[in-house]
C-alpha cells in the first residue's frame, strides 16, 4: 500500500510495483542534449537512429505511457488519500471497448505487433495497443524501442502517476500465460520498493537551492574578473569560469528535466527550460528526445550494428566497437579511424559547438506546434543575446571573440569529458536486453567523493542513475553499495573506478578499435 507521503507499507511486491509512483515519482521528461550524450551528435548520421526505428515525426516533450495493474483495485487495505489516488489512477478516462475486456494474448502474438503502425506493449502483464498513440507520444520515438515487448520496468522507471491513467485507454487484454518473473527482475523490483519506503526518491530542496546559489556565484565570479581587468589573462580566467558555470548548470538542468527536484512536472519543466535553453543555449526538446532514447537503449545497435543510441553514432570520426567498425567501407574513413585514440580528447573541445548546431537545427526543422517552436527558438535566441551582449559590452576590441571562443571550447571539454566516462568503452550490443541488464552492462561508475560528486554533477553514479533516473543525485551514493551487491548476485559487472582509470579504459577501447581499423584498411587497399 502507498501513503501520500510516498512510503510503502505492508502489501505484496506486485502491489508495491503497481502503485509505487503514485506518491513518490515524477514524470520522466529528461533534459536537453549534453548530459549523458557524448560526441554522438557530430556524425551526419546522428539523426538516423530515430528514422530507422519509426520514421515518425518528432515531438518536443517527454511524457509517455504507463499503466497500473487491475489488482490495485482489489487492494482493500488501502486507505485515506492513497486509496482515492489509487482509484483515480486505475479508473479509465474513456470507456474501453467491451470486446477487449476479457481477451488474452500470448507473448508470441504481442511480438508480432512491433511496427509503428501496429504496435503493442506489455506493462505488468497487461497488453496495450498504442498504434494510434505512438505518433503522438510526447517522449518521441523512444517508445518504439519497446514495440512488441514487455516494457514494465522501463515504464516504471520513467513515468509519473499521472501517466498510469493514460494507458487504460489502450488496454486490450492480458498476457495469456504469465511466465514466472526472472530472479533478476524480481530482486530489482524489490530493491526499488525498498528505496521508495526509505523516501530516497524525494529531493532535498535545500540541496538544490545551494546548487543554484553555487552556480550563480561561479557566474558572478566570471563577470567580476573581466569587470576588474581587461588583460588577456583575465579574459582567459573569466572564460574558464564561465565554462565551469555552463558545465554545472548543465548538471542542474539535467536534474530538473529528469523530474528529480519537484513533485510537479511543470515546475521541473519551467526551470529546465530556463537553465537549458536560456542560460546554455541548448534545445530542451531536442535533448529530451535524444536522451530518452539513450536511457531506453544505452549503447544498443540494430542487427546490422547501426547505432540506435545516438550517443554512439559517431562515425566517421569515432567507432566505439569492432562491430560498428565492420560497417565502414570507405577507405578514407578507415584511415581516419586508425588514429581515433590520438585525437579523441581534442574533439571534446568542439562538442558544445556540435550540440548548439543540432539544437538550432531542431528548433528550425522539427515538427513542432507554433507555440513550442516559439518557446524553443525564443529561449535559445535569448541565450545568444545575453552571451554575445555581455562579451561585447564588457570587453574591448577583439577580446569578446577570445572570451566567447574559450568559453565554448572549455565548456565542451568539461561536459564531454564526463559523458565519455559513463558509457564509452563499455559493452556495445545488438540484441534486445531487458531493461536492468541493458543499463548495467553499458554503464560505468566513477567512485564517489566530494570532488567527483561535484565535478560530474552526480553522474559519476551513472549505473544508479540509469536504473533510477528520477532519484535525486544526492541519494545516489546512498544506494550504490546495495546496487553493487545486486549486480554481484546476478553475475553483472559493476564497474566502479577512478577518473584516471576510467579515462584509460576509454582510450584503451578506442585504441583497440583503431588497430582493427588499420587492419581493415590494409585488407581493403
Curated annotation (Swiss-Prot):
Organism: Physcomitrium patens
Record remark on domains: The histidine box domains may contain the active site and/or be involved in metal ion binding.
EC number: 1.14.19.47
PANTHER family named among the record's database cross-references: DELTA(5) FATTY ACID DESATURASE FAT-4, FATTY ACID DESATURASE 2
Positions that bind heme: 137, 159
Designated name of the protein: Acyl-lipid (9-3)-desaturase
PROSITE patterns attached to this UniProt entry: CYTOCHROME_B5_2
Reactions listed under catalytic activity: (9Z,12Z,15Z)-octadecatrienoyl-containing glycerolipid + 2 Fe(II)-[cytochrome b5] + O2 + 2 H(+) = (6Z,9Z,12Z,15Z)-octadecatetraenoyl-containing glycerolipid + 2 Fe(III)-[cytochrome b5] + 2 H2O; a (9Z,12Z)-octadecadienoyl-containing glycerolipid + 2 Fe(II)-[cytochrome b5] + O2 + 2 H(+) = (6Z,9Z,12Z)-octadecatrienoyl-containing glycerolipid + 2 Fe(III)-[cytochrome b5] + 2 H2O
Pathway per the UniProt entry: Lipid metabolism; polyunsaturated fatty acid biosynthesis
Amino acid at each position: 500500500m502507498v501513503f501520500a507521503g510516498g512510503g510503502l507499507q505492508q502489501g505484496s511486491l506486485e502491489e508495491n510495483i503497481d502503485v509505487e509512483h503514485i506518491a513518490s515519482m515524477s514524470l520522466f521528461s529528461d533534459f536537453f542534449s549534453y548530459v549523458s550524450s557524448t560526441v554522438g551528435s557530430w556524425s551526419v548520421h546522428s539523426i538516423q537512429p530515430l528514422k530507422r526505428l519509426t520514421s515518425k515525426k518528432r515531438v518536443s516533450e517527454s511524457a509517455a505511457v504507463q499503466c497500473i495493474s487491475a489488482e490495485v483495485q482489489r487492494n482493500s487495505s488501502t486507505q485515506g488519500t492513497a486509496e482515492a489516488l489509487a482509484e483515480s489512477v486505475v479508473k479509465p478516462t474513456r470507456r474501453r471497448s467491451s470486446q477487449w475486456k476479457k481477451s488474452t494474448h500470448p507473448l508470441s502474438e504481442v511480438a508480432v505487433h512491433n511496427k509503428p503502425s501496429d504496435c503493442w506493449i506489455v506493462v505488468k502483464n497487461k497488453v496495450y495497443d498504442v498504434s494510434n498513440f505512438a505518433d503522438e507520444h510526447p517522449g518521441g520515438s523512444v517508445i518504439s524501442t519497446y514495440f512488441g515487448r514487455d516494457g514494465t520496468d522501463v515504464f516504471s522507471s520513467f513515468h509519473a502517476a499521472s501517466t498510469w491513467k493514460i494507458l487504460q485507454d489502450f488496454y486490450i487484454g492480458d498476457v495469456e500465460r504469465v511466465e514466472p518473473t526472472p530472479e533478476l527482475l524480481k530482486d530489482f523490483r524489490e530493491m526499488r520498493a525498498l528505496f521508495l519506503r526509505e523516501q530516497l526518491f524525494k529531493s532535498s530542496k535545500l540541496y538544490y537551492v545551494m546548487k543554484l546559489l553555487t552556480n550563480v556565484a561561479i557566474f558572478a565570479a566570471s563577470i567580476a574578473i573581466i569587470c576588474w581587468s581587461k588583460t588577456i589573462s583575465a579574459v582567459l580566467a573569466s572564460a574558464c569560469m564561465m565554462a565551469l558555470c555552463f558545465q554545472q548548470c548543465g548538471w542542474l538542468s539535467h536534474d530538473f528535466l529528469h523530474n528529480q527536484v519537484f513533485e510537479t512536472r511543470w515546475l521541473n519543466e519551467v526551470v529546465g527550460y530556463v537553465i537549458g535553453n536560456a542560460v546554455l543555449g541548448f534545445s530542451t526538446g531536442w535533448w529530451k528526445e535524444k536522451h530518452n532514447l539513450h536511457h531506453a537503449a544505452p549503447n544498443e545497435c540494430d542487427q546490422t550494428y547501426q547505432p540506435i543510441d545516438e550517443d554512439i553514432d559517431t562515425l566517421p570520426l569515432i567507432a566505439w566497437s569492432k562491430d560498428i567498425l565492420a560497417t565502414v567501407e570507405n577507405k578514407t574513413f578507415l584511415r581516419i579511424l586508425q588514429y581515433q585514440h590520438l585525437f579523441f580528447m581534442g574533439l571534446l573541445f568542439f562538442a558544445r559547438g556540435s550540440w548548439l548546431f543540432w539544437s538550432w537545427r531542431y528548433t528550425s526543422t522539427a515538427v513542432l506546434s507554433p507555440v513550442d517552436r516559439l518557446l524553443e527558438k525564443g529561449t535559445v535566441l535569448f541565450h545568444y543575446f545575453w552571451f554575445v551582449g555581455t562579451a561585447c559590452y564588457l570587453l574591448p576590441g577583439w577580446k569578446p571573440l577570445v572570451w566567447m571562443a574559450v568559453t565554448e571550447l572549455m565548456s565542451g571539454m568539461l561536459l564531454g569529458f564526463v559523458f565519455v566516462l559513463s558509457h564509452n568503452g563499455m559493452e556495445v550490443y545488438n540484441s534486445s536486453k531487458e531493461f536492468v541488464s541493458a543499463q548495467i552492462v553499458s554503464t560505468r561508475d566513477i567512485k564517489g567523493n566530494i570532488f567527483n560528486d561535484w565535478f560530474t554533477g552526480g553522474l559519476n553514479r551513472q549505473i544508479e542513475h540509469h536504473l533510477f533516473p528520477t532519484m535525486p543525485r544526492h541519494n545516489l551514493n546512498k544506494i550504490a553499495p546495495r546496487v553493487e551487491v545486486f549486480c554481484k548476485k546476478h553475475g553483472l559487472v559493476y564497474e566502479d573506478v577512478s577518473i584516471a582509470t576510467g579515462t584509460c579504459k576509454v582510450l584503451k577501447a578506442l585504441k583497440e578499435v583503431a588497430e582493427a581499423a588499420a587492419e581493415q584498411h590494409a585488407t581493403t587497399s
